[in-house]
Structure formats: structure tokens, C-alpha cells
């Protein structure tokens, strides 16, 4: 049996048709969902690019004890285990931070595209004019360059290859599958789409513009938490740009789904589609991940698993699951022994319908920023570390997280606060011992 993991960046669950009504067109993800087990309550244990991937390749939590950082020498990447088990391993990535974060470990082939979104344009190449774009006041210079880098890199890809980057990557992956279709393989496809900056080509760029007549500012990379710059129509425009980027990603990855079918790999391949996190687009007074607010629009993630004959089509698992569960699931399916130290659990019994006890609580957060806990009956407690006071929501009746119940339910809030910090205890002990040993 083969394993393919497709990780898309910045996919909001509420924008995907398989999860509920939306104006956004995602027919290919929806088609995959109709053949899969859909996990309705999957969360990123830390909704940020590299920490989320660290959780998904090591099976360990990051929000408790480590910031955004590269894999350490002692971290075991799941690809290393598949390689040791005799699998052919490969990864294709246009996510700009992966190569510098040691995400190539265990892969016999690691193809990283040098002209992806937000990657520095090669020296000696003049950046294209981007004066048509609006950047909010106070925009960091480093991030200000992300858009001209992205715009110029896309032009380089088109000039050198005649293709958009998602198209190029999907075609490269399809070619790799053609070459290795007779072998047992573990393949990781890591796409930065539909992450900002939004320099989406037509027909997707204007597909969702309000009334198709927006004449306001072009905002390819908005910024929060200060939203004082927002003018009427701006946020509808920002949503439209994001929606177009998601539909573009859906289009190209639909081609990859087709290739898997055409190469007759479908019946013998576990296909996992997961997003690393979502994105705030003004719902709680902020845009993008600044401060890592762990509201649903950021922390709730897409997770689908397909294996015909073993995973029932159109099935759903309603229990709480985390991206930290992904590697244990893959190892379980492949019959590879789980190493000590993994902190998730296999979701295979949930995917197959055999039955998996529902987790009573799920923990998530962002190291040194905030932490939270979601309960099986739908409550969500957020410890903001004193920044703006704690929050408590009843998600079944308040999915948008607008009615803070912290004053109405102090006993429940206190209980969840204690549970959250009890969950942190092993790491607090570990870190304090490390500090003590370092001072000797």
C-alpha cells in the first residue's frame, strides 16, 4: 500500500463546500470528500506554518514547549520511518520555509521550488512593479517585499516553464507517480496555496469580486491586528482574493486527483488531504495570524482520508482530532511500529468506522502567546495570557465565537483552565529541569 499526504496552506474549513454551504467553488476537494472520511472537528495544535508541520511529521505537540523553529537533531521525521521500512520516499514543496526547517529529513527526493510565494527573488533579477498594490500603514518591510517577490517569482516560473507554480508542481508530482507507480511509496506534497500573498491569475482573480465591479484598492497581503485602514468594500475584496486563490488551488489539485485515478493508484493508496491552519479575515478584529488568535477561522482545519474498500465513502467522524494524530495514523495503516514519544493517537479506527472513543478534550495554542482547550460537548476555553482576558464559547450555539461566556460560567472556565495547565505540566517540568541542569 502507498501513502500520499497533500498539505495545503491556509485553507479555511468554512470556505470548503464539503463542510457546509459556501459561495466558494471547491468541486475537486468536495469530490475527494465524497470518497473519503471527513473529520468534522479537526484542529491544528498550533495554527502556524512550521509548528503545524512539525506536529504532522513528528507526532509531538509544539504549542507547549517550542516556538517556530527547525526540527531539532533529536526530532524523528515520519519519512525516516517509512524509508527504514523500505518505502520509496519523496516530497514536493513550494512552501518557502520547509527547506530551512529540516523538513527534508527522510526523503530520498526532496524537490523544493525556488520561485514560490514569499521566497526571496534570486539576486540579479529586477523586481516587477507592484505600485498598484495597497499596503496598510506600518507594514513590516520584510513582509512588504513578499508581494513583489511573489509577483516576480510567478513571472519567472511562467517565463522558464510556461506554467503557474501550482500547475508545475502538480505536473511534476504526476510525473513522479508515473515513474514510481510500481513501487511502494510515501509521498508528501506540500503546497503554499492558497496562502497570501494573493497574486492569483484569471479567471480566479476576479471570480468572487463583489458584483464583479470592485474599483477600490488592490490589497494582496492585508495586515492585522490594526484594522483602522479598512474602507468600505475592502474586506469583501480581501475575501474575494482569498476565495479565488482557494478555487485555483482546488482546480490544480483536482488534476493531481485525476492523475492518481488514471495511473490506477487509487485503490491501493491512502490519500490524506490536510490543511495546516486557516486564516482570520476580520472576524475578530484582526487579519492573518498576528498574535495567533485560536478562533475557529484559524485553528479549525480540513482533514480527509481516502482508501477505497477500507474507508467508507461519504463517512464522517464527529469527534475531536488533532493534526498531531496524523503521523500515528499513517504508521498504523502501514504497519510500522510507533516510536516512543509520539503524543497523538491513530485515527484509523475512526476512518474505517471500526470505532474510536471520542476524546473528551483537545488542547491547542501557540507557544508563549495563548493556549486553549475544546471539549467534546462543544465548549472552547481560550487563555490569552492576560492580553485581553480569557474567553469561553459554546461552539454548537455560537460557531462564530461572539458570545463570551467567561462571566456567566466561571466554574466551567476555571475547570478548563486547570485542565489546560495540567496538560502543560510535563513540559513545565522538562523545561525547569533543563534550566536547572544548564546552571550547574
Where are these regions (language model features)?
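Catalytic domains that recognize anionic headgroups
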Residues: 1-440
Amino acid at each position: 500500500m502507498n501513502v500520499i499526504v497533500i498539505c495545503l496552506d491556509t485553507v479555511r474549513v468554512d470556505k470548503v463546500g464539503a463542510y457546509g454551504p459556501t459561495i466558494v467553488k471547491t468541486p475537486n476537494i468536495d469530490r475527494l470528500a465524497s470518497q473519503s472520511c471527513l473529520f468534522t472537528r479537526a484542529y491544528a495544535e498550533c495554527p502556524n506554518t512550521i509548528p503545524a508541520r512539525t506536529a504532522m511529521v513528528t507526532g509531538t505537540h509544539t504549542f507547549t514547549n517550542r516556538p517556530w523553529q527547525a526540527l531539532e537533531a533529536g526530532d524523528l521525521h515520519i519519512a525516516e520511518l517509512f524509508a527504514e521500512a523500505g518505502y520509496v520516499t519523496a516530497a514536493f514543496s513550494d512552501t518557502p520555509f520547509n527547506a530551512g526547517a529540516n523538513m527534508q529529513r527522510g526523503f530520498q527526493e526532496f524537490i523544493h521550488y525556488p520561485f514560490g510565494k514569499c521566497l526571496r527573488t534570486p539576486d540579479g533579477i529586477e523586481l516587477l512593479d507592484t505600485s498598484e498594490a495597497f499596503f496598510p500603514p506600518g507594514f513590516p518591510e520584510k513582509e512588504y517585499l513578499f508581494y513583489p517577490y511573489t509577483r516576480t517569482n510567478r513571472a519567472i516560473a511562467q517565463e522558464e516553464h510556461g506554467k503557474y507554480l501550482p500547475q508545475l508542481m502538480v505536473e511534476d508530482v504526476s510525473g513522479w507517480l508515473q515513474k514510481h507507480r510500481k513501487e511502494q511509496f510515501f509521498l508528501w506534497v506540500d503546497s503554499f496555496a492558497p496562502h497570501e500573498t494573493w497574486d492569483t491569475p484569471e479567471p480566479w482573480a476576479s471570480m468572487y469580486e463583489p458584483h464583479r465591479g470592485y474599483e477600490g484598492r488592490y490589497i494582496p497581503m492585508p495586515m492585522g491586528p490594526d484594522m483602522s485602514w479598512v474602507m468600505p468594500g475592502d474586506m469583501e475584496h480581501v475575501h474575494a482574493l482569498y476565495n479565488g486563490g482557494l478555487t485555483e488551488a482546488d482546480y490544480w489539485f483536482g488534476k493531481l486527483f485525476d492523475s492518481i485515478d488514471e495511473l490506477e493508484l487509487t485503490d491501493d493508496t491512502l490519500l490524506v488531504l490536510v490543511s495546516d491552519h486557516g486564516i482570520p479575515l476580520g472576524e475578530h478584529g484582526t487579519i492573518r495570524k498576528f498574535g495567533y488568535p485560536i478562533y475557529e477561522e484559524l485553528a479549525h482545519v480540513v482533514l480527509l482520508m481516502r482508501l477505497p474498500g477500507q474507508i467508507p465513502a461519504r463517512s464522517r467522524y464527529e469527534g475531536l482530532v488533532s493534526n498531531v494524530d496524523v503521523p500515528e495514523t499513517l504508521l498504523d495503516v502501514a504497519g510500522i511500529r510507533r516510536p516512543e514519544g509520539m503524543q497523538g493517537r491513530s485515527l484509523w479506527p475512526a476512518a474505517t468506522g471500526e470505532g474510536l472513543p471520542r476524546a473528551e478534550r483537545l488542547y491547542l495554542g501557540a507557544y508563549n502567546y495563548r493556549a486553549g482547550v475544546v471539549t467534546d460537548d462543544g465548549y472552547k476555553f481560550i487563555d490569552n495570557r492576560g492580553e485581553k482576558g480569557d474567553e469561553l464559547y459554546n461552539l454548537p450555539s455560537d460557531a462564530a465565537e461572539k458570545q463570551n461566556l467567561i462571566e456567566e460560567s466561571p466554574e466551567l472556565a476555571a475547570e478548563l483552565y486547570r485542565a489546560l495547565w495540567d496538560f502543560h505540566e510535563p513540559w513545565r517540568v522538562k523545561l525547569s529541569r533543563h534550566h536547572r541542569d544548564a546552571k550547574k
